[in-house]
Amino acid sequence: AMLLLVFRKVYICNIMSHTNIMQAEENDLVNILSLQKKSFMVVAERMNKFDLPPLLQNQDEICDEYQTGIILKYVSDDGQIVGSVRGRMDENRVCHIGKLIVHPDFQNKGIGRELMTEIERLFPHCHTFSLFTGEETPNTLHLYSKVGYNIVCRKEMEGISMIIMEK
């Protein structure tokens, strides 16, 4: 009976946590872009580099990403969008994952991991998942490693040392 109780509690917790993740709608994009800029500003300040592409992205560009892929949002219990991730599949069945963001006040609570799990689940026909992150973001590198991504190579992109990872 105790085992069933433990199983049931874990199962219910998993259902509850995933109700926070859903596909973004077009009217969410303004809030997601704002969250993106807030999240990447922390990185920009650490690097003293304020022209990072995620900080410069505009509404038209995020709308294009919305049209060509999937954008997920993580909604807190009080209805605020506090996390997001994007994915799109190319013609070679590679899923390109990008812009995993979590509001600074909500980091280190498992939200990034949940978003990664869910975006991968939504692309069952992909044989490879690919992403890149800045070398100066060790916490992000650690998260991606924990969820199964391996470093493929390093390259300079727009003056930033980037790490390409795949799963």
Where is each model-derived feature located?
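A short beta-loop-alpha structural element at the N-terminal edge
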Residues: T19-S34
